[in-house]
Amino acid sequence: MDPLQEANGTFALNLLKILGEDSSKNVFLSPMSISSALAMVFMGAKGTTASQMAQALALDKCSGNGGGDVHQGFQSLLTEVNKTGTQYLLRTANRLFGDKTCDLLASFKDSCLKFYEAELEELDFQGATEESRQHINTWVAKKTEDKIKEVLSPGTVNSDTSLVLVNAIYFKGNWEKQFNKEHTREMPFKVSKNEEKPVQMMFKKSTFKMTYIGEIFTKILLLPYVSSELNMIIMLPDEHVELSTVEKEVTYEKFIEWTRLDKMDEEEVEVFLPKFKLEENYNMNDALYKLGMTDAFGGRADFSGMSSKQGLFLSKVVHKAFVEVNEEGTEAAAATAGMMTVRCMRFTPRFCADHPFLFFIHHVKTNGILFCGRFSSP
């Protein structure tokens, strides 16, 4: 297995577990865009700061810790994922904003552009705090086709802010096999043993790849997007099994093993999947701190590969991701749906996502987890 791919996959599942500690909350993030944004900052880190970042990003498995091969790996990964001519739309806004007193090194700026196609921008956080915040928000909105606004809420930056890493991503893809809007109807979603909430449930009967993992009592369904460059992978535990059991068990190695296409049966399935829209905003500082990246956010930070200025540290790492799942695919215009009853033939297997599940948007060629999330409640 490619070491960078393994590092990114490990980091993805670690983050999913940390951000999902409150099991009642929905979770949605793009681990690949977070790791690429942080890897860019990692280029400027030295000493303990660098080794902690390598550990948090699971890059300690990659040779030449901090060496060029990691950044070259990200360069080819990002080129592949963001390439033009795909049947899906992916818009990433990745930028490091530094206070104009930071004096960022030209060599660091060049590397960011070369490997991450990211420009750095120097703002006046000290003198024009609010203007700087609004400037960042406007830039992100423009980069994500106005889907992601207000990435920085009021008060998130102040006159002491020195470095802000902003990462926002917006994805739009159509299902290879679309759901018929006329089959969408209201059904109860079992939030917990004692609570139900109504949800607009989509329905599709067709052939899909599906498997059952006995050790965790979980069905796994694969829903391909048009041209099959990306798949949505849904992990749905049996009704008597808590989703947290699955979350505890899943590692990147198991994820790859469980979702191997040659291990899945292609069969006719009745799929019930809720329509949902999630927009999640994370201040990543706490999660990264829990993964061992402690020095980067305070006075002990060493970013001498980025600037010769002493005392430079990362003030904020913010991540915002948006997903909408509907009949056409992911993110499309809303439509009203007629009511219809679905007659169920007994012998067709069912995949009925009417209780909490995990979902992943998986990039087939690179085996990368572009997005991952948990749908706990409508």
Curated annotation (Swiss-Prot):
N-acetylmethionine: residues bearing it: M1
GO cellular component terms, A-Z: collagen-containing extracellular matrix; cytoplasm; extracellular space
GO biological process, one term: gonad development
Chain positions found as Phosphoserine: S153
Compartments where found: Cytoplasm
Record-linked CDD domains: serpinB6_CAP (cd19565)
GO MF terms, alphabetically ordered: serine-type endopeptidase inhibitor activity
Expressing tissues: Expressed in the inner ear hair cells, keratinocytes of hair follicles and epidermis in abdominal skin.
Subunit structure: Forms a complex with the monomeric form of beta-tryptase.
Function: Inhibitor of cathepsin G, kallikrein-8 and thrombin. May play an important role in the inner ear in the protection against leakage of lysosomal content during stress. May be involved in the regulation of serine proteinases present in the brain or extravasated from the blood.
Record-given protein name: Serpin B6
Lineage: Eukaryota, Metazoa, Chordata, Craniata, Vertebrata
Gene field: Serpinb6
